[in-house]
Amino acid sequence: MKAYTIHVTGIVQGIGFRPFVSKLAHELELVGTVRNDTNGVEIYIQGMEKSCKDFVGRLQSDLPLHGRIDTLQVETAELQRLESFTITLSQGAKGNAFIGADMAPCAACLEEIQDSKNRRFQYGFTNCTNCGPRYTIIESTPYDREKTSMRIFPMCKPCQEEYEDLQGRRYHAEPNACDQCGPEFSLKHMDGTVIASGMEAIELAKYHVQQGSIVALKGVGGYHLVCDALQDAVVQKLRLRKGRPRKPLAVMAGSLETAKHYVHISEIEKEVLLSPARPIVLLRKITEYNTDSIQAKTNATFERDIVYKDVSKIHQKQKITNEEYPVAYEQTVDKTMVSPRLPIAPSVAPGMNTLGVVLPYAPYHYSLVPTDALWVMTSANRSGDPVLYDDVQAFDELAGIADYILTHNRKIISPVDDSVVQVVNHKPIMIRRSRGYVPISISVVALDTSPTMLAMGADMKASFAMNRKSHAILSPYMGDMEHQRVQELLWTTTNRYEDLFQLQPSQVVVDAHPKYYTSQCGRAYAEKYQLPIIEIQHHHAHVGAVLAECNIDAPVLGICFDGTGYGTDGTLWGGEFLYCHKSYMERLAHLSSAPLPGGEIAVREPWRQALWYVNQLYPDAPPKVIERWKESLPKGWQVLEKMLPHMQMIQSSSGGRLFDTVASLLGLGHVHLYDAHLAIELEQMALSEVGDILPMMMDNHVLDSMTLVRSIIKELERGESVTKISADFHKTLIYYIGEMAKRCCEERHISHIVLCGGVFQNRILLEGVMNELDEYTIHIPTESPMNDGGIALGQLWLGSQMQR
């Protein structure tokens, strides 16, 4: 007879690890205990030596689906008088617990909520040890029900029995609940008056969406605005009310099959769509509908829900023949027909060849969104603000935007926005890392011997990070730091991470930009706690994030194209070719610099920099195509034109600004309506054409933007189409980035290349440059965002390198 104490750290709380341990111990006829603590999980086993060894081996080989073991320490222990194996109360002590992310319903839970004979039929908060909420409901560790927002919902007898059933998948499932004891929905008017509760609230909300109303929905990590994506009038109404005139809206498809009617879905994209994280996935639209999918075969029939104002009749069905279908949607009084045979509203994603699609990721989505429906599911917050999650605030801010609010009484402890992913060259690329991914840590070997650091990230797409030894824990996407609420959320979430993960930073890492709010906060934090501070150049941190993910120790050429970043020479960078090795960085080449007339306002109004280019190229007599272009500019452009020769302007080598300039010259717009708006539309224009390489000078390690802009204007003079010029611009930039990269690699004997920065979210550019440089080993970020959301990870990695 032997006895052992086993300490396990990693993602071992909130994923069914203790029930797994208990079942395994019973199977091997071991006695003992298992409990959570803030380090992870502590196990005591007692039994035959072979059984104990088998137990330790299977802890690792049979680990639950969403778990991860980082360390496993086995120590000999004293024998005790025990008769069984039990899950005991958790123990609180400072330590190393990791927390799992929120997960979409598992197959077993889905089967229950879709089974009319099951007691959880259509229950919107169904979960088990394999799925459901985690990060958004946890107040503190160890992970027990009384330390979550579920503590106010005592379990009923059947739920308690499930919780205690060793063989069941709800054995010690902390959020376990049913419609008799758990959270419930209520549908309310915007003045707070309750209209309906429970399942009736969900069905009535569905009815109102199908009728053309806008409903605010309290989700897993915050509020969404929901409307029918097939009704253009209501989508336009949503845009008008929210003040979001152009930015593409994400949609939720009721099923994968419904999504396939509107977008192309590869096998990898399908895997991402159906993953437990359930992010929004950017997918290519089907521009021409297959007639077989629009019209069913002759005499075919199908069922639809008939939703009456008397919701007691909600489940009645009606048969409609194919011949009746074309008029059925328009002529039924309630207008509830929602079918994949109808086209998507043009105003959902105007001018876009892609569509952001998410599948149902909470149990209530399966009751709310019909399987054949396509609904707008967009965050209810203002652009750049953090996700809206407070109930009182939601009523205040959504009055005048939403017609109704579908809310529930489970408190959101930690808000999270939807994550966004796109697949490029068969690899999922992270655009926004939030729900479903945070707070899962990223393993970074180089951090193993580093002290705990706080990396503040950047001001755009803000996300900070902390590390515990070799694990980087990134915060959710928070928004842009120009908004006060994001600034407040930064401090709130930083304090929360320190408490939740029991971390106390001993160093602070910030962006070198002296005016970044995040950098100022980091300096204030360091001063408050008397900590050393490390400054990291912005684009070096972009490269560092990829080095952290890929564990690269060799020298690399970092090609970083983004919107802006403070350079070592005091100008703004953003079109960079950097030699990077460990903590060393050297600028080898870059895009040529151009001024930003008016400073920050020129970022929002790209016509200003475009006007500078035009006046440099044609100081006396511009071609007629440019004269016509000037006539399209906002009022007051003549004043700026006269001032240009006398203005002191900051210089920028930004690739993002070059995209904006070309978009303005092509007439796609002169002012950004949302972040990267014009660059995105320029990419969309290029998708339908095959580009040619235009003249662009490459001299003395500088790619000359001026000659490329001249080439663009020459094409306009020749009457080339906007789509063709857009494709030519992309093709040219791809070619010359490749040529400059090859020159740099040859000169410095480099075989590894890193592609990073927000501009490389452009699928054409990223795929093109990867193909152009296929003779090298190419590295791109996949676990952290390509944009500034990944900066904090790079800051952590470089901070650790600078201490070696």
Residue ranges of model-derived segments:
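Conserved phosphate-binding/catalytic loops in two-lobed NTP-binding clefts
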Residues: 511, 530-542, 751-753, 763, ...
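Internal gly/pro-rich beta-alpha loop/helix module
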Residues: 62, 162, 371-447, 647, ...
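Conserved phosphate-binding catalytic cores of ATP/NTP-utilizing and phosphoryl-transfer enzymes
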Residues: 260-265, 367, 387-394, 439-450, ...
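Short glycine-rich phosphate-binding loop at a beta-alpha junction
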Residues: 216, 502-514, 533, 749-759
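Glycine-rich phosphate-binding/hydrolytic loop that grips phosphoryl groups
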Residues: 539-561, 565-567, 606-615, 660, ...
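A contiguous, well-structured pocket-lining segment that forms one wall/lid of small-molecule binding clefts
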Residues: 175, 182-184, 458-496, 614-750, ...
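A phosphate-binding glycine/aspartate-rich beta-alpha loop in the early core of alpha/beta enzymes
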Residues: 76, 214, 222-287, 343
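Intrinsically disordered, low-complexity, mixed-charge
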Residues: 1-175, 179-186
